[in-house]
Amino acid sequence: MSFIREFKEFVMRGNVIDLAVAVVIGAAFGKIVTALVDKIISPLIGVMVGGIDFSKLSLTLKAATVDTAGKEVPAVVIGYGDFINTILQFIIIAFAIFIIVKMINKVINKQPLPPETPSEDVLLLREIRDSLKK
């Protein structure tokens, strides 16, 4: 089997296509969650705790200075506010995935498995067995 044909069969399998669709939807969902956290949740929490904008929270380790040549040396800053926003995004995404998986499991568990119908061979063998018992 040629390399190209093997690759084509691999790509056309259902799991790979499903994964590709999931990645695209996941990327779009990530953008939605980012907007939700940055534009709605963080400002609301900021208002509740005294008007704080989480994205601007930071800790300055070393202030900006000007060296002897007159060139500005930037400040050394830890921007922990963005980290807080990222944690909020993670929690929202994890919760959304939890709800989706819970709903899928509920749907799967509600559907009873159809009873297996025996094949014609099995039915014929049962008839032979029953007739031999008589």
From Swiss-Prot:
Record membrane topology: Multi-pass membrane protein
Localization of this protein: Cell inner membrane
Chief localisation class: membrane
Keyword Cytoplasm: no
Keywords: Cell inner membrane, Cell membrane, Ion channel, Ion transport, Membrane, Transmembrane, Transmembrane helix, Transport
HAMAP family: MscL (MF_00115)
Function in brief: Channel that opens in response to stretch forces in the membrane lipid bilayer. May participate in the regulation of osmotic pressure changes within the cell.
Family stated for the protein in its record: Belongs to the MscL family.
Protein name: Large-conductance mechanosensitive channel
Organism: Xylella fastidiosa (strain Temecula1 / ATCC 700964)
